[in-house]
C-alpha cells in the first residue's frame, strides 16, 4: 500500500493537535526537523497528497474486486487488520476525509469495523469520506 506516506504527511498536523499538550513541542520540533518544513506547510499541501493516497489504495480496491468480502478472502486476515487498522486510525485523527463517498473501500471498511462484535464502531472516528 503506497498510500501510507501520503496519508501520514497529510495528517501530521492533526496528529500534533491530538497529542497531549506536554508532548506537542517535542512532536513539532522532531517532525519539522525530520521533514524539513513546518507542520502548517505540510497541511497546506493536503489536497495533492490525498489524491496520491487515494491512488495508492488502488491495489486494495483491485483485490476486493474479486468478490471476496475481505482482502484475505472469505475471512479477515493479516492484510485486513493491518490496512483496515491503519485507515481507521487515520480516521480517528483526520480533520478532513480521505476517501470519496463512492469509494468501494467504504463497504470493506464497514466490514472491518463490524469485526469483534462491532468494536471498530465503538471508537470515535471523524468522517472517512466526503
Per-range role (PLM):
Residues 1-130:
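C-terminal alpha-helical interaction module
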Amino acid at each position: 500500500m503506497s498510500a501510507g506516506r501520503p496519508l501520514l504527511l497529510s495528517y501530521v498536523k492533526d496528529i500534533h493537535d491530538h497529542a497531549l499538550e506536554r508532548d506537542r513541542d517535542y512532536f513539532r520540533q522532531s517532525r519539522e526537523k525530520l521533514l524539513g518544513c513546518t507542520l502548517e506547510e505540510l497541511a497546506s499541501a493536503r489536497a495533492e497528497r490525498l489524491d496520491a493516497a487515494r491512488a495508492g489504495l488502488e491495489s486494495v480496491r483491485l483485490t476486493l474486486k474479486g468478490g471476496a468480502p475481505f482482502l484475505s478472502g472469505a475471512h479477515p486476515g493479516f492484510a485486513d487488520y493491518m490496512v483496515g487498522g491503519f485507515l481507521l486510525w487515520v480516521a480517528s485523527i483526520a480533520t478532513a476525509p480521505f476517501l470519496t463517498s463512492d469509494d468501494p473501500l467504504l463497504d470493506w471498511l464497514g466490514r472491518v469495523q463490524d469485526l469483534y462484535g462491532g468494536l471498530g464502531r465503538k471508537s470515535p472516528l471523524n468522517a472517512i469520506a466526503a
